[in-house]
UniProtKB/Swiss-Prot annotation:
Native organism: Cronobacter sakazakii (strain ATCC BAA-894) (Enterobacter sakazakii)
Superkingdom assignment: Bacteria
Subcellular location, record wording: Cell inner membrane
HAMAP family: Aas (MF_01162)
Protein name: Bifunctional protein Aas
Transmembrane segments: 258-277, 409-433
Length: 719
């Protein structure tokens, strides 16, 4: 009777909804594993699960007075994770057919993300051979019973949902020592809990996600700042978004791809969200690609209009682009302010009260945004992402990293770069964190100073950029930083070492591709391993396809919610080419994406990048990684830049050409380093060419297309 009353009361106050199949809860040998976000979680499980479970309650809590008062109403057993007998008792209860609820985190989350998972919970699941049923509680973290004070906008009676996820199991790991088996079982359960979070994520568009972030963190919460040093709150960002969206209606049609050539600035974020709100598809134009690269992108995506800024073209010395590219209409943001009518203002203020009504009808699976590949190996391709794929990647990042509303991101990578867009804009905005948008990653003295001045806690970039920041920074500039993330190129040992020695900070290396929105794997404090790029993100499937001549690893293929909708190619403008990849049996499977990267997995699931499949040379029948050659050069000359290309060789098929900015780099020095590292002599180039400056892409990566042209020109000249 008491439970029935509280069930009615909770349903009335919190409008509780239970989703998922409750049938598996009545099976034999059931272990229920909810996330833990508030003091209400135990009551929610007791009141709304269709079974009467036994709760495993940690000893420190079970001895409290309120737990003794609840003893007549619920069954619980004290759990001391340091004592094996506690675990044995739970295994026995599961074996007897009693459903057991255990909170694997062992404590209420203080970040909103998953905390560490205690190994004992995973070991109970494996030892008892239980059916594991993950449960995801959403909304309770917004109550005053959570521990997220100051991180979310807490309220009296938020809506709470309980998601019962499909059952799974955890097999007993194969390891000689019990300690290792416990650890591995705990890691398996951690993976289950992360997959549960991904499975329970809401279906929403980018604009709806922004609205929900505003509601969750408060409209007066600062979320965005740029070099004007006038922070935007969620409310002021929403105002700008509505303004831009209203004006874009006059210059474009629904479902039209519109080019955006804008710097890292607050208004750029408003333009992106304003465009998707009104059903336009922003195409992020890479202004460093030059006239030829931009023309290819415009053709592939069938872009008719590019929105930019006069001030941006002035400061970036980019007027030649608008003068030479005449196939599109150029619209300048400065001109739009004068076009706002009284009717427009009324529309904007009305929708500021009800922003959801400003969004045109669309689905999460619809195309939301177009990015372009770097063009490092040919013409840029348009990569079409849906709302779902972009938001899935944000949620994957939030699932493994404990970013909170207390964090502040320094985002200097351009927004046309997938790394800069997803990690540098969408992730902080939708996590309640603040982000400082800076227009250039090349200002090596300014960026560290701004990290210090604006109290940033998260910084990310390529290995090249991070190395330069470290050299120019004061040892105290990064005293508040807790996450340093490297991606887009291989992390160099010298960069890693200077960050550790000078600032006491560990760089967390990740791996991503534009087609995956972009993050695929990343090292995080709870799961990091030197020499790897972390584990594959939750909700993704990965497989390796054998490559002839490559002994270790294979071509990485991926499938998951963050995979693109497809390519737009200049050869077939406007036609979407959906992803598909040949499986190991040679059959093309839709939905899979072939990265073209050669990787290997270690026994713990960490990813080791061997190189691009296209960046291997076949010399005298042996496969040689061009990245390995560049690593040799960096080991000899860490302060300079090096890049390898391939040329034809009549005797051996192919030969290596090393371009370097070090005039004193010789083959003898490289050969000596190769011998010390056990690298075969085939990997030591005979053709070494000095350049004062390597041609670079906007991301800071070497422009291999330009380097290959240099090689081809010389071969043509000698021919």
């Amino acid at each position: 009777m008491v439970l029935k009353f509280f069930r009615w009361l909770f349903r009335l106050l919190f409008r509780i909804q239970v989703y998922g199949d409750t049938g598996p809860l009545t099976q034999q040998r059931v272990l229920i594993t909810p996330n833990h976000v508030s003091f209400l979680d135990g009551a929610l499980m007791a009141l709304f699960l269709p079974v009467r479970p036994v709760f495993a309650v940690y000893t420190s809590i079970s001895q409290q007075w309120y737990m003794r008062a609840l003893k007549p109403l619920i069954d619980f057993v004290p759990l001391d994770p340091t004592k094996p007998m506690s675990v044995k008792q739970l295994v026995r209860l599961v074996g007897e057919g009693r459903p057991v609820v255990i909170f694997p985190e062992g404590r209420i989350s203080i970040s909103g993300s998953l905390m560490k998972i205690y190994e004992g919970a995973g070991f109970v699941a494996a030892k008892s051979q239980a059916t594991v049923i993950p449960v995801r509680i959403e909304g309770a973290e917004l109550t005053f019973f959570s521990r997220l004070k100051g991180l979310v906008k807490r309220r009296l009676f938020p809506r709470i949902s309980i998601h019962i996820l499909p059952p799974t199991s955890i097999p007993m790991p194969d390891a000689p020592k019990a300690r290792d088996r416990r650890k591995m079982a705990g890691e398996m359960l951690h993976q289950v809990m992360m997959e549960a979070r991904m499975a329970a994520r809401p279906r929403e568009t980018l604009f709806e996600a922004l609205i929900n972030a505003q509601k969750r963190y408060g409209e007066s919460k600062s979320c965005l700042e740029d070099i004007n040093f006038k922070p935007d709150t969620y409310r002021s960002l929403m105002m700008k978004t509505l303004f831009v969206g209203r004006i874009l209606d006059k210059y474009s049609a629904p479902r039209e791809a519109i080019g955006l050539m804008l710097p890292n600035a607050s208004i750029s974020a408003a333009v992106i969200f304003g465009a998707v709100m009104r059903g336009r598809i922003p195409a992020m134009m890479n202004y460093t690609a030059g006239v030829q690269g931009l023309t290819s992108a415009i053709t592939a995506a069938q872009i008719k209009t590019i929105f930019t800024s006069r001030q941006f073209l002035d400061k970036g010395k980019l007027w030649h682009l608008s003068e030479q590219i005449t196939s599109v209409r150029w619209v300048f943001l400065e001109d739009l302010k004068g076009e706002v009518t009284a009717k427009d203002k009324a529309w904007i203020f009305a929708h500021l009260l009800m922003p959801r009504l400003a969004q045109v009808e669309q689905q999460p699976e619809d195309a939301a945004l177009i990015l372009f590949t770097s063009g490092s190996e040919g013409n840029p391709k348009g990569v079409v992402h849906s709302h779902k794929s972009l938001l899935a990647n944000v949620e994957q990042i939030r699932t493994i990293a404990d970013f909170t509303a207390d964090d502040k991101f320094m985002s200097a990578l351009p927004l046309f770069h997938s790394f800069g867009l997803t990690v540098g804009l969408f992730t902080p905005l939708l996590t309640g964190a603040e982000v400082f948008l800076y227009p250039s990653p090349l200002h090596y003295r300014v960026v560290p100073e701004l990290v210090y001045d604006r109290n940033c806690t998260v910084i990310f970039g390529t290995s090249t950029f991070l190395g330069h920041y470290a050299r120019f920074a004061h040892p105290y500039d990064f005293h508040l930083v807790r996450y340093v993330v490297a991606g887009a190129e291989k992390l160099q040992e010298s960069t890693k070492q200077i960050w550790q020695d000078k600032f006491g900070l560990r760089i967390l290396e990740g791996y991503g591709v534009t087609e995956c929105a972009p993050v695929v794997s990343i090292n995080v404090p709870m799961a990091a391993k030197p020499g790897t790029v972390g584990r594959i993100l939750p909700a993704m499937d990965a497989r390796l396809v054998e490559v002839p001549g490559i002994e270790q690893g294979g071509r990485l293929q991926l499938k998951g919610p963050n995979i693109m909708k497809g390519y737009l190619r200049v050869e077939n403008p406007g036609v979407l080419e959906a992803p598909a990849a040949e499986n190991p049996q040679g059959v093309s499977e839709p939905g899979w994406y072939d990265t073209g990267d050669i990787v290997a997995f270690d026994e713990q699931g960490f990813v080791q990048i061997q190189g691009r499949a296209k960046r291997f040379a076949k010399i005298a029948g042996e496969m040689v990684s061009l990245e390995m050659v560049e690593s040799l050069a960096l080991a000899v000359s860490p302060e300079k830049m090096h890049a390898t290309a391939i040329k034809h060789d009549a005797a051996k098929g192919e030969a290596l050409v090393l371009f370097t900015t070090d005039p004193e780099l010789t083959r003898e020095k490289l050969a000596q380093q190769a011998r010390s590292k056990g690298v075969p002599e085939l990997a030591v180039p005979r053709d070494i060419r000095f350049l004062k400056q390597l041609p670079l892409l906007g991301s800071g990566k070497p422009d291999f297309v330009s380097l290959k042209k240099l090689v081809d020109q010389e071969e043509t000249h000698h021919a």
